[in-house]
Every structure is written in structure tokens, then in C-alpha cells.
Amino acid sequence: MPWRVLTFRLPAEPSRHRVAVWRDLRRLGAVPLQQGTWAAPDGDPFDAGFAQVIESITTAGGQPIVLTVADDEANAGQLEALFTEQREAEWTEFLADCGKYETELADEIAKGKLTLAELDEEEQSLDRLRRWYRAIKTRDLYGAPSAATADRRLKDCAAALERFADRVYQARERP
């Protein structure tokens, strides 16, 4: 698979442009190669994000240069390894948040905080986890090692929310 490499320069001030570009590249799933140089696989779902980043750099008065790296086995292997390492770090962070979510539900049960407002809040938290899962899954082209565990943990979180919801509704039925 060919890769796109973006190298750019931005004016030193204001720094918000540099931060915005950095955030956009991270959100896109690009991997940093060195300061001001990032890489991502060529094609969907990365093309639109790269175009947006290039526009942001240009609008901020910067100079973007985009190169397409041929599907060279040695380079591709190194880039795939960096890319998968980045996705693995994202999955690890996601798994930690799944653990926090399950702990939060257990704490609410222990406190007897079984209200509809709390249920709504926990549903929103699960929706956030689902959005995050989809975003990482979309970028994880090479199947990072923790992807399957993340899928299982998200299902566990959904099941934990169902059990919490059952308790909330049972608590509402009590006089």
C-alpha cells in the first residue's frame, strides 16, 4: 500500500495553528516521523483528512509538501509497524477507559445512585466509547494486537450498562 508523507512549515506565531494541525493529524491517525513530518496510508479514510490538514496549513500561512511513497517493502514494513504501534497505543488507552467506565458503573451501584439522570449520563459515556471505538477501528488498517480485546471490552461495557439500567428501573418500581 502506498503512503502519503506530509512535511510542512508553519509560522512560529500564533501557536494555535501548529496545535490545530497537530490535533488534526492525530485525529486522522497519521504517524509522526519527525518534527513537521507525518505519514498515513494513501486512500480512504485518510484522503479527506489530509486535504483538510493541507488547507489548514496553507490558510495559516504555512508551506505543506505532500509526497507519495511507493509501495517499497522495506519502507512499507517500517511505516506499517509505526502505524500499528500508534493504533496499539490508542487501543490501550481505549481499554483503560473501558475499565474506568465499568468501575464507574460499579461505584454508582455501590452508592445506590440508581436514577434516570445517572442512567442518561452513563448512556452518553457509552456512546462516547462507541464513537471512539469506531474512529480507531477505521484507522486500524493492519489490525493492532489489542483490537479484538477492545471489541470484547466494548461489548462488556454495553452489557454492564444493561445491568445498570435494569437496577435503575427496579429501583424506580420500589415504593
Where do the protein language model's features map onto the residues?
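Residues lining hydrophobic/aromatic ligand-binding pockets adjacent to catalytic sites
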Residues: 10, 14, 115, 120, ...
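Cap/lid and interdomain-hinge subdomains that line or gate substrate/regulatory clefts
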Residues: 100-104, 108-112, 116-119, 126
